[in-house]
Amino acid sequence: MVVSVRFFILCSFFSFIISSSIAHTSFRPKALVLPLTKDVSSSIPQYITKINQRTPLVPVKLTVDLGGGYLWVNCEDGYTSSTSKPARCGSAQCSLFGLYGCSGDKVCGRSATNTITGLSTYGDIHGDIVSVQSTNGNNPGRVVSVPNFLFICGSNSLQNGLASGVKGIAGLGKTKVSLPSQFSSAFSFKRKFAICLSSSTSTNGVIFFGDGPYNLNMDVSKVLTFTPLITNHVNTVSGFLGEPSVEYFIGVKSIRVSGKKVPLNNTLLSINQNGIGGTKISTVNPYTVLETTIYKAVADAFVKAVGAQTVAPVAPFGTCFATKDIGFSRMGPGVPSIDLVLQNKEVVWNIIGANSMVQLNDVICLGFVDAGSNPSTSKVGFVMGGLHPMTSITIGAHQLENNFLQFDLAASRLGFRSLFLEHTNCANFNFTSSA
């Protein structure tokens, strides 16, 4: 009986969100769109989006965390809104967050994490209006609103380390309260979202919530390759201890450099019973981080395939060349491809020169980081310094730039495509004209 009552309350809550959202708009959008800007003003590059929140509406800049579980916003820095409502202990709103605590005034809350710095603080759970643009996949459309969008109240200290003007973090992870889940519940569209990071600080990338088309001078949804998303049943990220991972993992079976298989300890490529190993995708790690033995094997194979002399490395990288020794083309630096082989040898994530290399004046480096020698680059998710990374391969943001990624949450699969292969890029969504 208790389970039935809780289920009824949960269903009623989702129905309330949906009906309330529709009440605030005269049509039901099939998809939403947000701009995504690369910001290098802080020590770690971040990818920033903007929503409108509160009453009256205020533009709020947020760092995007692909593997984040929720939205958190700094409530100490002038947060005022006539429509903000705390979530009461025992309510359906609280239960959506999984594990939570209750304060003396009967408001529920939980830990919020700054995944750039690793700092966590406890914050109350609130709901408030959020407004974003709809889209038909070709252009932005009408503004639509969710009147009771749930978030955690962060603090001034939690905001430290975020890019200039950013007030919180927008989580896109596998929870009931991430942005993709709340938007799809509010507007009853498909449980899909797509993200495309621009490599430039002067042009916008894009996030789509909902199904395609996704027009970036072509409908990218038509050219995607698919691979299953894998669940890691153990999560050691601060604020989620004891819960399954909310991050996105894929099954890398092997790595090739210039078409040749790199010898690896294959047990590192799978997730063990303690949640260690495997491959995840991250927008808060600026570069791909590899477990030490994987890094050394890949770097050695890469140097051999390039055939040029290495030079003194530039931190945080360990493998660098003189820029004059590397040619360039439309695909970026002319270096061998690094291929992540997925469920079979026909399904491959190709990492070409534009994504594998980082140019630093007269030096150009392999943009992969050794987790053992550079534990500080991992931020959260490393155990005992960095010699034992929780995840063997973390695909970082530089390797994601100008790659289109669609996350189909209902089917638990990832669609991906390098836009260099399609002669387009992530900055080609038309934000300037309306549908």
Description of each model-found segment:
Residues W72-N74, G168-L179, L290, S392-G396:
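Short beta-strand-centered segments at strand-helix junctions
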Residues V2-F7, S15-T25, D39, S43-P45, ...:
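Aspartic protease catalytic domain
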Residues D77-Y79, N136-G137, T201, P213-Y214, ...:
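Acidic glycine-/aspartate-rich tracts in secreted/extracellular proteins
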